[in-house]
Amino acid sequence: MNFKSTIGLEVHFELKTKSKIFSPSPVTYGAEANTETNVIDWAMPGVLPRLNKDVYRLGIMVALATHSHILPVTHFDRKNYFYPDNPKAYQITQFFQPLARDGYIEVEVRGKKKRIGIHEMHIEEDAGKNTHGANGYSYVDLNRQGVPLLEVVSEPDMEDPEEAYAYLTKLRQIVQFTGASDVKMEEGSMRVDTNISIRPAGQEKLGTKVEMKNLNSFDHVRRSLAYEEKRQQQVLLSGGRVQLSTRRFDEATGKTVLERVKEGDADYRYFPEPDIAPYHIKQSWIDEIAESLPESPFERRKRYVKEYGIKEYDADVILQTKESSDFYDAAVAAGADPTLAANWLNTQVNGYLNENQVGIADIKLTPEHLAEMIKMIKDGTISSKIAKKVFKESIENGTDPKKYVEDKGMVQLSDVSVLGPMVTKVVDDNPQSVEDFKNGKDRAIGFLVGQIMKQTRGKANPKVVNQLLNKELQSR
């Protein structure tokens, strides 16, 4: 029996504001517990929320970048539930009138393009954080309480884990390039909840959905959905029923584990937030934000391919993060050849980042240093082999490439008046190689190049040496 999967995603992004959504408390990742809170975050009696309007500006940027319809009037609502990390016993969110609806993102999977709908996106406050100690006590940190979130809810348009992965990748890229969030999953500024149901192929009615919450990597999203697909298929094939439930992904086993069975969708008794007035969004403000939107990743891709002439694959690798793309643009602006800059960034720089598990913002190599090194390669000042040594020094210690090359005597020997006599002597001293060359043995010239490189301790310009050797051998 064949089955069809239906997948939906809810993605929470921490909006990059200096203070919280309803209080003046600062937002700093990694701060000591409960040091970035005040009476509003604690829900002390009589305090009132004060809206940080910058969250709307950032949210509108994402809405515009995802072709979403921005509602002219929005308001906040109370989602009622009790948990220790929620001192008010309700969360301020947008339920009835969210920020935006009916957007979409286009993805490409297995060579085919598909449009994934965005049901809505709404602004809300984050909850605090519970930590369960080994001594039997639980501790609450309210630093995260009130941090502004933008929740993007997809339509259930994805039909397999690869489509979900592609959607997440594209959504993360879009949000990051707007500057609305830094989308760092390792710091919790991007969190993913998934739901998946399966049904026999041809059946219109959707199956019973299973939720998985707070998946902390794209790989976990893909693996958990793939496992859950197979698990639900086995349940149905054995004559059982899939339970409406919440499960978690166990990274060690690669399986999902039941957390709780649900009898139905939770009733949070939503009602309008009485302490915050409805928010009117003027079209003139939307137009102003639209004009100030940064260049999108799709626009950059077109520029890289058409103006810079690099391959689409190289452009896609560069555009995986905004930091990488900004680094590349700065290197080209500093005079680097676009193709060589793309090659060095995607191979040597990314190789160093992966090996050392750091981001491009953590390295000491600057775009200007990379550009300087590439210019020296192109004008023949250094060879590609020497360039790798220069690159290692610059990326580890921030050393200026030009100064390092000069101080270490690494300048490539390209002077024909010096190399010419050396070539003539090497050819004279190796008559067998000359004979081999005349007989069509191409390896002969490689041997002669090696002799020159040996005499110059690797400093001779291979391109110039090859040109001189070919000219000399042709004359014999």
From Swiss-Prot:
GO terms for molecular function: asparaginyl-tRNA synthase (glutamine-hydrolyzing) activity; ATP binding; glutaminyl-tRNA synthase (glutamine-hydrolyzing) activity. It catalyses: L-glutamyl-tRNA(Gln) + L-glutamine + ATP + H2O = L-glutaminyl-tRNA(Gln) + L-glutamate + ADP + phosphate + H(+); L-aspartyl-tRNA(Asn) + L-glutamine + ATP + H2O = L-asparaginyl-tRNA(Asn) + L-glutamate + ADP + phosphate + 2 H(+). It holds the Pfam family GatB_Yqey. Gene3D superfamilies: 1.10.10.410, GatB domain, N-terminal subdomain (1.10.150.380). This is Aspartyl/glutamyl-tRNA(Asn/Gln) amidotransferase subunit B. Signal peptide: none annotated. SMART domains: GatB_Yqey. Heterotrimer of A, B and C subunits. Belongs to the GatB/GatE family. GatB subfamily. GO terms for biological process: glutaminyl-tRNAGln biosynthesis via transamidation; translation. SUPFAM superfamilies: GatB/YqeY motif, Glutamine synthetase/guanido kinase. Keywords: ATP-binding, Ligase, Nucleotide-binding, Protein biosynthesis. NCBIfam families: gatB, PRK05477.1-1, PRK05477.1-2, PRK05477.1-4. Its EC number is 6.3.5.-. Allows the formation of correctly charged Asn-tRNA(Asn) or Gln-tRNA(Gln) through the transamidation of misacylated Asp-tRNA(Asn) or Glu-tRNA(Gln) in organisms which lack either or both of asparaginyl-tRNA or glutaminyl-tRNA synthetases. The reaction takes place in the presence of glutamine and ATP through an activated phospho-Asp-tRNA(Asn) or phospho-Glu-tRNA(Gln). The lineage of its organism: Bacteria, Bacillati, Bacillota, Bacilli, Lactobacillales. InterPro entries: Asn/Gln-tRNA_amidoTrfase_suB/E, Asn/Gln-tRNA_Trfase_suB/E_cat, Asn/Gln_amidotransferase, Asn/Gln_tRNA_amidoTrase-B-like, GatB, GatB_C_1, GatB_Yqey_C_2, Gln-tRNA_amidoTrfase_suB_CS.
